[in-house]
Regions:
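Short, Lys/Arg-enriched, disordered terminal segments
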Residues: 1-10, 401-404
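Short hydrophobic/aromatic-rich beta-strand segments that constitute the beta-sheet cores
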Residues: 72, 262, 335-339, 368
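A broadly conserved sequence feature marking short terminus-proximal activation segments
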Residues: 174-234, 241, 373-389
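Cys/His-rich short segments
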Residues: 220-274
Length: 404
């Protein structure tokens, strides 16, 4: 009897033709070349883990390693559009809910390995917006031990500059990948959970700004700063929040006049005497995290914002629909929405235990992983959206440190 978690094998001619065409397409579009120093692979299935700094990372991964046929683990968000969902099913992708336990997807991953086909997984769970690998859950080590397959890493460089999450408009430069063994099947079994997790962290780490310092490849285009205000909401000079604005290639503070510009290589530079601008986006984000840590350390911490609540109602799009208005409050223990939904008063309280991060659309809304229905919060001030997203992992960090 066929298991309800069974995964269909790839349609080999379709998969092979797709990956064959990928390399010339990616060269023409993004100047991508697959590395030549790919080590020999073992017979049977492997688990390929990828860094996730750009929206197209999976294409570069598939083009890098044509020796295996991969089932990509894809966020359930994309399946909410029926047409995209049909395409993902055609390519035998595995649907997974983001940042919460999903027993069904784990069963499908295990079934894939057992039938002899390989997996492509991005442990970060979503594209990070900084070009530097974001922390991810240690559950990936537990999953690797469950799957019992050789573990490899594919690191993508340049994908962040090509299509940054804060302004996903194509900027042609160059994309490169690296491929490396993380652990053999025997090592996956013998290493402790912590040892395996630390090895995964080390092999997956990517810093596109450090790579760019070495390569200095221009990623041209107009309005290079557009959208950065939704990520970099805190002024590094005066400490004002939600005061940053962008204009063309410049980012500035509407409160104190602090100003910087983004060059063709993606680096930031101060403009004018006295301006304080970090050279790299992830360093600016670290300033925001440090400020948030100080807020979260207070016993009465609460992040509050007027907002709209959204449900997913249209099966022909991944976008959500406003269905009410109220207030979102994030505390040490829960996210609360209080207001209206579909014309009726409502109160949702989501415990933070079990929610590692909020999936988000930068400058728009963040999703709330839960078992009730697809729910999103769209703050009225779009810049504070990023503060909610950054706060959740830091709350977990604070609680874990406090309880240690």
């Amino acid at each position: 009897m066929r298991s309800k978690y069974a995964v269909k094998p790839h349609i080999k001619p379709v998969y092979d033709m797709l990956t064959l065409l990928l390399r010339p397409y990616l060269w023409l579009k993004y100047r991508f070349r697959a590395p030549k120093d790919i080590p020999a692979l073992p017979d049977g299935p492997i688990v390929l883990l990828g860094s996730h700094t750009g929206n197209l990372d999976f294409l570069f991964a598939l083009a890098t390693l044509r020796q295996k046929r991969f089932h990509a683990v894809v966020a359930a968000h994309f399946y909410r559009n029926h047409r995209i969902g049909w395409l993902l099913n055609l390519f035998r992708c595995i649907k997974k809910e983001q940042f919460r336990a999903d027993v069904e997807s784990i069963a499908r991953m295990k079934n894939t390995i057992e039938m002899g086909e390989s997996l492509l997984i991005y442990p970060e769970g979503e594209v990070n917006g900084t070009g530097r690998t974001a922390p991810f859950s240690d559950s990936i080590a537990k999953l690797a031990k469950l799957l019992k397959a050789p573990l490899y890493a594919v690191r993508t460089h340049g994908g962040y500059f090509t299509r940054p999450k804060w302004n996903p408009v194509q900027r042609r430069g160059k994309v490169e990948t690296e491929f490396e063994l993380i652990a053999t099947a025997e090592e996956v079994k013998s290493l402790s959970m912590n040892e395996l997790y630390e090895r995964i962290e080390q092999k997956l780490f990517v810093d596109d700004y450090a790579w760019q310092k070495r390569r200095m490849i221009p990623f041209g285009g107009k309005n290079r700063a557009k959208g950065l205000e939704n990520l970099l909401y805190l002024c590094p000079k005066c400490g004002g929040e939600l005061t940053t604005r962008t204009d063309g290639n410049d980012i500035y503070c509407a409160a104190c006049g602090n100003r910087g510009t983004v060059d063709e290589y993606g680096f930031l530079h101060p403009v004018g005497e006295g301006s304080v601008i970090p050279e790299m986006v992830p360093d600016w984000v670290e300033l925001e995290r440090d400020a948030l840590r100080r807020e979260i350390a207070k016993d009465d911490f609460a992040l509050i914002a007027p907002c709209h609540i959204q449900y997913h109602l249209d099966p022909n799009t991944t976008a959500h629909t406003d269905v009410g208005r109220g207030t979102a409050t994030l505390t040490h223990t829960e996210l609360i929405y209080e207001g209206t939904a579909e014309g009726k008063p409502i109160r949702y309280a989501f415990p933070l235990e079990g929610i590692y991060k909020f999936p988000f659309n930068m400058g728009n809304q963040f999703d709330v992983p839960n078992t009730i229905r697809t729910i999103s919060i769209r703050p009225e001030n779009k810049q504070i959206n990023e503060k909610f997203v950054l706060a959740l992992p830091l709350i977990h960090e604070y609680i874990n440190t406090k309880n240690a």
